[in-house]
């Protein structure tokens, strides 16, 4: 179990590191940016969603493997963790559907200023972060 957890942790850190490098390179050299893509093709969603869902699966697995390891009270785990996961998941999917899956995956679109975009330029990322926080609280696992 420890070896599996370490392997998953390394894989998750690698995906996160590669993503961070792509973002930094895109900011540093916009003409050769990796994100958002210059041209949206059929493989663009795969490039975006495979690492994203792989990282989510890794976080789920790490939470299951370390379930209940941290001494968090039950009321906190279930009373806060579950509602945060449910509400943030609803926010992500609501905005993704309003935004359009292609534009969410990097296709050109229009500036949105309605819905949660009234409050943040990146509400899906904010909600994704909240979802991870909710899962960390619920699972009470040290590696999430």
Question: Where are these predicted regions, by residue range?
Answer:
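Short, amphipathic, aromatic/basic-enriched membrane-interface segments that mark the entry/exit
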Residues: 112-122
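Membrane-anchoring alpha-helices and their flanking helix-loop junctions
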Residues: 1-113, 129-144
């Amino acid at each position: 179990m420890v070896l599996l957890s370490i392997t998953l942790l390394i894989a998750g850190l690698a995906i996160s590191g590669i993503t961070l490098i792509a973002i930094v390179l895109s900011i540093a050299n916009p003409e050769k940016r990796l994100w958002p893509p210059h041209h949206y093709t059929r493989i663009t969603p795969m490039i975006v969603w495979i690492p994203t869902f792989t990282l989510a699966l890794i976080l789920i697995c790490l939470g299951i493997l370390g379930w209940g390891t941290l001494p968090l009270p039950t009321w906190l785990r279930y009373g806060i963790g579950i509602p945060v996961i449910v509400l943030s998941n609803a926010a992500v999917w609501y905005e993704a559907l309003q935004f359009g899956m292609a534009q969410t995956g990097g296709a050109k679109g229009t500036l949105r200023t309605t819905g949660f975009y009234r409050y943040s330029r990146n509400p899906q990322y904010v909600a994704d972060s909240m979802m991870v926080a909710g899962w960390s609280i619920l699972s009470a696992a040290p590696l999430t």
